UniProtKB/Swiss-Prot annotation:
Keywords: Chaperone, Cytoplasm, Ribosome biogenesis, rRNA processing
Domains: entry comment: The PRC barrel domain binds ribosomal protein uS19.
Keyword Hydrolase: no
GO terms for biological process, alphabetical: ribosomal small subunit biogenesis; rRNA processing
Location within or outside the cell: Cytoplasm
SUPFAM superfamilies per record: PRC-barrel domain, Translation proteins
Name the UniProt record assigns to this protein: Ribosome maturation factor RimM
InterPro entries according to UniProt: PRC_barrel-like_sf, PRC_RimM, RimM, RimM_N, RimM_N_sf, Transl_B-barrel_sf
Domain PRC barrel span(s) in chain numbering: 98-178
The keyword Ligase is annotated on this UniProt entry: no
GO annotations of cellular component type: cytoplasm; ribosome
Amino acid sequence: MSAKSSNLVSVGRITAVYGIKGWVKVHSYTEPQDNLFEYHPWWVKTRHGVKQVEIDEARPHGDAYVAHIKGVDDRDLAMAYTAADIAVERDLLPELEDGEYYWNQLEGLSVFTVFGGEQRLGVVTKLLETGANDVLVVQGDAQSIDQRERLIPYVPGQFVLSVDLDSKRILVDWDPEF
């Protein structure tokens, strides 16, 4: 079986090898973090391409996890998976309520503000988790009012007025001078 790259969603990253028996250190992007191990199979994006792997054992280790990839039984084999993104097929992710979005759905959307008349601020390049609320990182581009990077709190109803995935836009109430 193969998965199209467009159907894959990054859910974590293999950061390093762990020990000599083929274990790897894993950083999870899921919330809660151990949800990462509920998804099967993993598609690992290495410098050699995308490969399907199965995890046969995993456990917490510090602020991350360590995992064993089935069939990878020594440190040298595990080394080939370091610095690799972990992805799963999009349809494995739980359905969200109306008005809720996965971060990867928001990345790449154009952001417009209604402050002082509709103006393009740029494109969402990533999101940050701050504890209080998530933050959109919006980078200005050739079509926006300037090239600045802006950090806009993702607070629906207050700063984020609407998200339209079909038209690939987010409408915000945000002063462009901030």
